[in-house]
Amino acid sequence: MGRVKLKIKKLENTNGRQSTFAKRKNGILKKANELSILCDIDIVLLMFSPTGKAAICCGTRSSMEEVIAKFSQVTPQERTKRKFESLENLKKTFQKLDHDVNIREFIASSNSTVEDLSTQARILQARISEIHGRLSYWTEPDKINNVEHLGQLEISIRQSLDQLRAHKEHFGQQQQAMQIENANFVKDWSTCSMQDGIQIPLEQQLQSMSWILNSNTTNIVTEEHNSIPQREVECSASSSFGSYPGYFGTGKSPEMTIPGQETSFLDELNTGQLKQDTSSQQQFTNNNNITAYNPNLHNDMNHHQTLPPPPLPLTLPHAQVYIPMNQREYHMNGFFEAPPPDSSAYNDNTNQTRFGSSSSSLPCSISMFDEYLFSQVTKTKLSQRF
């Protein structure tokens, strides 16, 4: 049984090509080496496996460099002639083996491949030049001399405008959504703040502040501005408070037409105490560069102006601000009328001394003192004096 005849063509299986090359490589290298020894010739055999690995066979007579240098000295015409001679010998060999192989097709296919690659390169170069020319039309549209190019440029511009409009609408929707989200966030924060008790702004909370003494410490409480700026007011039964320029007192003791020496001494004691408080307040104002103002002058047209807000109260040591030990809270009213003729200035039911003006009703502020408290103070002062 003889060997299976192998058809000379490219093997489709990669593993088959690799195995065939591995089997026949050693035989070819052996034949080349034998030919070099028997004929005493210069020979170089260079092969690459299907995987790309090189296999070289050199004769014993010369090296690879000498053979390549000798081959380079051959003219191109001689190379072509030798090539065709080799192909004819190969064709005769195939015919003896009954292999129908067209050698011309191998040569033509190789030449056509190079020509095809050259043609494709020329086509690509032409397309690149055309694209560069179209790009130049955007910067210099006056150079366009083709209606087709003008139409393509118009289409490109319209597409760009459509993309810009779509991007603008999308960006506007995103911005509007962000504004709505921010508004909802602020609303939720305000709701949470109101639920937590933060309902009055800080500026409104600082507009009504006063100092009181509580357990030998200085505290801050919210109260109307009705006590400290009005302690120098001269209260007299004959005074009418005709104008506000004389609103601030001159430091003189008030003259009151109330019978009884005890009441006069009480007023003198009270006025002295209030003057000390006012002088302490004035000293504190001057030391801290704070502008004093009267919140009850808003009804005076001559003094109606925008007053600065009160300074932020601070907790200060007792050595800087004088506060009496028997500090009481004085509530001032805005309007009082003169007592009727049949009524007495002293009311036993309420245990309070009420001072009124004999003139018409005018806006003023008058202190109301507790009789029992100041009676004890008067007795103590009298005992110390005598």
Swiss-Prot record:
Pfam families: SRF-TF
Main location: nucleus
InterPro entries: MADS-box/MEF2_TF, SRF-like_MADS-box, TF_MADSbox, TF_MADSbox_sf
GO molecular function: cis-regulatory region sequence-specific DNA binding; DNA-binding transcription factor activity; DNA-binding transcription factor activity, RNA polymerase II-specific; protein dimerization activity
Keywords associated with the record: DNA-binding, Nucleus, Transcription, Transcription regulation
Stored SUPFAM superfamilies: SRF-like
Localization in the cell: Nucleus
Record's keyword annotation contains Cytoplasm: no
GO terms for cellular component: nucleus
Gene Ontology biological-process entries: pollen development; pollen maturation; positive regulation of transcription by RNA polymerase II; regulation of pollen tube growth
Known tissue expression: Expressed in pollen.
Domain MADS-box: 1-53
Residue spans of biased composition, Polar residues class: 344-356
Start and end residues of each stretch annotated as Disordered: 341-360
Keyword field contains Transcription regulation: yes
Gene3D superfamilies membership: Transcription factor, MADS-box
Domain of life, source organism: Eukaryota
Quaternary data: Forms heterodimers with AGL66 and AGL104.
Function: Probable transcription factor that forms heterodimers with the MADS-box proteins AGL66 and AGL104 and is involved in the regulation of pollen maturation at the late stages of pollen development and pollen tube growth.
Name the record gives this protein: Agamous-like MADS-box protein AGL30
Organism per entry: Arabidopsis thaliana (Mouse-ear cress)
